[in-house]
Amino acid sequence: MSEFTHFDESGRAIMVDVAGKDDTRRVATARGAIHMLPDTLGRILGGQAAKGDVLAVARIAAIQATKRTADLIPLCHPIALTRVVVDFAPETEVSRIVCTVTAETVGKTGVEMEALTGVSVALLTIYDMCKAVDRGMQIGDIQLVEKQGGRSGHWRLPD
């Protein structure tokens, strides 16, 4: 098993030194879901939310969050993102919306945290925009789905 990388030999928190790493293309995809009442999902999909186009605002929030990850997660490196893609998949049969975020860069460290932060903020934005009609919404299942690049190479969540 690997060791934790964000602690020194004394157990103090550190920012990992990436100076000796090569710049490589790095891609990470994360996903998560928000469960809601069927009526809430219907309002979102029908464009009937009082605050506007919920998914358009959540998409912009996700992109903005990926760019601000280092400001939110203390030991993350600021990363120059080259691409961010945000997708939403409504699942009416289970009354939820699945959000997937893919982040890319060419750099010395991965973009897993950026993708995970993007998903989290997108789902929080949906909650914020719809809480007036459904305070019982549940956010969950947030996880890394795939990462590529760097020393550890390619990893994919098992099916």
From Swiss-Prot:
MF terms in GO: cyclic pyranopterin monophosphate synthase activity
Q: Which domain of life is it from?
A: Bacteria
Pfam families recorded for this chain?
A: MoaC
Pathways per UniProt = Cofactor biosynthesis; molybdopterin biosynthesis
Known EC number(s)?
Answer: 4.6.1.17
Chemical reaction(s) catalysed: (8S)-3',8-cyclo-7,8-dihydroguanosine 5'-triphosphate = cyclic pyranopterin phosphate + diphosphate
Which keywords label this protein?
Lyase, Molybdenum cofactor biosynthesis
Q: Which residues form the active site?
A: D128
The residues listed in the UniProt record as binding substrate, with positions renumbered to this chain, are L75, C76, H77, M113, E114
Per the record, the GO terms for biological process are: Mo-molybdopterin cofactor biosynthetic process
Matches recorded under InterPro entries? MoaC, MoaC_bact/euk, MoaC_sf, MoCo_biosynth_MoaA/MoaC, Mopterin_CF_biosynth-C_dom
The record's family statement is:
Belongs to the MoaC family.
Share what the entry says about its subunit structure, partners included: Homohexamer; trimer of dimers.
Describe the task this protein carries out. Catalyzes the conversion of (8S)-3',8-cyclo-7,8-dihydroguanosine 5'-triphosphate to cyclic pyranopterin monophosphate (cPMP).
UniProt xrefs under NCBIfam families: moaC, PRK09364.1
Protein name as annotated = Cyclic pyranopterin monophosphate synthase
| Organism from which the protein derives | Thiobacillus denitrificans (strain ATCC 25259 / T1)
